[in-house]
Amino acid sequence: MADGVDHIDIYADVGEEFNQEAEYGGHDQIDLYDDVISPSANNGDAPEDRDYMDTLPPTVGDDVGKGAAPNVVYTYTGKRIALYIGNLTWWTTDEDLTEAVHSLGVNDILEIKFFENRANGQSKGFALVGVGSEASSKKLMDLLPKRELHGQNPVVTPCNKQFLSQFEMQSRKTTQSGQMSGEGKAGPPGGSSRAAFPQGGRGRGRFPGAVPGGDRFPGPAGPGGPPPPFPAGQTPPRPPLCPPGPPGPPGPPPPGQVLPPPLAGPPNRGDRPPPPVLFPGQPFGQPPLGPLPPGPPPPVPGYGPPPGPPPPQQGPPPPPGPFPPRPPGPLGPPLTLAPPPHLPGPPPGAPPPAPHVNPAFFPPPTNSGMPTSDSRGPPPTDPYGRPPPYDRGDYGPPGREMDTARTPLSEAEFEEIMNRNRAISSSAISRAVSDASAGDYGSAIETLVTAISLIKQSKVSADDRCKVLISSLQDCLHGIESKSYGSGSRRERSRERDHSRSREKSRRHKSRSRDRHDDYYRERSRERERHRDRDRDRDRERDREREYRHR
């Protein structure tokens, strides 16, 4: 085309676009989210392609000024009716729900959105379904509750806050009852409820029927075999991330399956498998554990047959890692992490664990009386290769003295520490005596106690000269304590001996002498209150004078 024709075509369509907006006024009320998830047109074009076709110039043979009709066929009329479908199992996927709805003759599904727990991403058992006509919604409300979906009859309700709160309460009750009984929820038939299924079976606002990506891989589904087969275009659902109950031994992956490397970059969000849950009895890098079968567990590849039940769990489980699960065996050893309680640790010459690992989640192995599942060699004393702790027995010097004995101090260091301790002792005694003479016994006692603790914590506390300093401080402390508690009674006893008064008078004097300290403190507090009252009166008088002056 020539340049002039292009300019004419572009600016001539402006009027048509305004006519189209007036003709399809119902589109103003359509949410942008609904436009994205709406089904394709009859000609197989995506919504983006339709928008692009709207802006294409007409052909040369068309009349530009006549306002030709648009070449896009709109199948969505802008009407959208939302329903809640509840009483579903947690492993029900959007494909299952779509098949059940299509079996009723309803083909205008616009949206299926499952409500999920924020903590683990597990379905709450109800979903929001949007259809494009009133007849479809009535058909769903009448016929779908009569259909059985995974052993349960769905409940179809209108979309409002009342039914939403009812479904939320029901999901909380089911979660709490499952936790109280100590058992996980019932899993899908033919597989283990604790198997690590990839995420992607349940749609999050996607149009139902989307084929999942080809890079998904199923995890092990039981104690020793691959998961059950699923139909084409349908992925297995996700289990709860933290199922209660004792973990069992993992099974090998299906034959001929290649797992992606653990550090190959983050996958797409929709195709990302859920992070594996690690228990304290499971090495890092292995698939999640399945339930215990009735009878002896099958042998684990690469570790030999376990002779008995798994050891009890010790400590809290570590947080789920960001790596996909890997099978044991020839794929390589797990990452540099501390071993679980029932497996031997690395040899003493092995490198320490990575800095991002919290050692508190991986306690060292203890002798719990259970046989280990590995007999390749005696386990070392410490998983990090540290020397064994020194056992002093029930009696012996404390650890500080042992450190002093191991690393002897030089003469200069010893004299420096001793001079420091002497200065602390002399200053503490002088200050305590001055405080006690002023009547502040609490400050004097605190000063002496602090000095004693500082000298005891020094490196030369085991020396005889240091012990002499400590004993002098303790004698001063006892003297001040006895003086603070019994000063009044001593005065009265001396008066008794000098004046030989009667017992009644001595009792009176004792009570008076005991009350003198209290009266002294009370009088001081009263004086403080009087000063405060005087200050308040002065402030009030000043305020009054200021107000009077302003008038």
Swiss-Prot record:
CDD domains associated with the record: RRM_CFIm68 (cd12643)
Modified residues annotated as Phosphoserine in this record: S494, S500, S511, S513, S525
Region: Necessary for nuclear paraspeckles localization, residue numbers: 81-161
Residue ranges with Basic and acidic residues bias: 389-404, 489-503, 515-551
Keywords: Cytoplasm, Methylation, mRNA processing, Nucleus, Phosphoprotein, RNA-binding
PTM-bearing positions, type Phosphothreonine: T157, T404, T407
Intracellular or extracellular location(s): Nucleus; Nucleus, Nucleoplasm; Nucleus speckle; Cytoplasm
Annotated spans, Sufficient for nuclear speckle localization: 404-551
GO MF annotation: an example: exon-exon junction complex binding
Keyword check for Phosphoprotein: yes
Its job: Component of the cleavage factor Im (CFIm) complex that functions as an activator of the pre-mRNA 3'-end cleavage and polyadenylation processing required for the maturation of pre-mRNA into functional mRNAs. CFIm contributes to the recruitment of multiprotein complexes on specific sequences on the pre-mRNA 3'-end, so called cleavage and polyadenylation signals (pA signals). Most pre-mRNAs contain multiple pA signals, resulting in alternative cleavage and polyadenylation (APA) producing mRNAs with variable 3'-end formation.
Domain notes: Contains an Arg/Ser-rich domain composed of arginine-serine dipeptide repeats within the C-terminal region that is necessary and sufficient for activating mRNA 3'-processing and alternative polyadenylation (APA).
UniProt protein name: Cleavage and polyadenylation specificity factor subunit 6
Taxonomic source organism: Bos taurus (Bovine)
Lineage of origin: Eukaryota, Metazoa, Chordata, Craniata, Vertebrata
Gene name of the encoded protein: CPSF6
